[in-house]
Amino acid sequence: MISQTLISTDHYLSYAWRCCLFSGKRNAVFPSLEMANHQLCEPYLSHLIVDMETLTTSRLEALETLRQPNLCNRGLHIYLLASKDDPAQMSFLRAAGPFHVIARDLSVVPFRQALLVPPERSIHAPLFPATEWKILSSLARGLTMKRIARQLNLPYHRVVYRLNTQLRLLGLPDRQSLIHLLHRLTLNRHHQTL
């Protein structure tokens, strides 16, 4: 029975995971969330670590998968490894769900410690509610604010208000910054290296 699963295509990280960090533990490494799908609903899986920098799908698609209630509501600790060089992305990942976000470039000892002793999520930590998540994912797909308001059956000014609230929580200066962030989150690794 696998209790810890790492999703990564980084061979160095996968090797370190198996041989140095948690050797002898019941762990597995998969190159994608799709390939690990059969493991994700197992009741004995306690830790899911997703390397957001090496995903073969977009980060936003991965977050959609990880936000599913069957994963979030059963006590599974979900860790997202991300580059600390992009603070806006780190804030977005923290707000996207009940995830523990860890800087990807930590050395071995702090990295292992972060996984062994998960931090308690602050009661005041902002999470995107379902409606705000729909607004953000619709914006990422290129829909206009008016169209989003129609789809959600909300007045336009309510959509603008909700979006501005999320901008403040993320510490972004304006909507254009959010659009750029969402664009980066919709790119997969192949598009980022072109």
Question: Predicted regions span which residues?
Answer:
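N-terminal regulatory/sensing modules of transcriptional regulators
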Residues: 1-119
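DNA-binding alpha-helical recognition surfaces that contact promoter or target DNA
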Residues: 19, 113, 137, 161, ...
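Short helix-to-turn junction characteristic of helix-turn-helix DNA-binding domains
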Residues: 139-143, 182
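Basic, Lys/Arg-enriched C-terminal extension of HTH/homeodomain DNA-binding domains
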Residues: 167-194
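Regulatory hinge/linker segments at domain boundaries
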Residues: 116-137
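Short alpha-helical "packing" element that flanks the helix-turn-helix/winged-helix DNA-binding module
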Residues: 132-139, 166, 178
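Recognition helix of helix-turn-helix DNA-binding domains
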Residues: 144-177
